[in-house]
Amino acid sequence: PLRVCGMVKKENHPGGGPFWVKGENGEITKQVVETAQVNLSDNNQLKILEEASHFSPVDFICGVKDYRGNHFDLEKFSNPDTGLITTKSKDGKELKALELPGLWNGGMYYWLTVFVEVPKITFNPVKEINDLLKPEHQPLIS
């Protein structure tokens, strides 16, 4: 399968970014990596993350059929070992949670991947409730 991932220039927005990743068997793949997947106590990893030029607004175009029109068995192209431990809260109590591989974090691990820069105007995130107050999320009134 093929994924073309739109990336915008990084301007202090949270989110994953395009990185080369070395797997356990030494294979090198292109991945969208979330901050939670990075060992922030490793200065080398932190430097790579901080110097990244782009991040992913999650604009993907996906090809899920082969050249004969047959659907790929997408499970064969995922990496079940890419789950991560994150911190969540419930009733004011901090909890650790095991997150299974996400769609682009592990579910598309072995896909052919192309990163392309897209215009910033395509990026209108809603990461928190106040983002809905921004002009780009308001209805057009004529």
Task: Identify what each model region corresponds to.
Residues 1-142:
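OB-fold and OB-like single-stranded nucleic-acid-recognition modules
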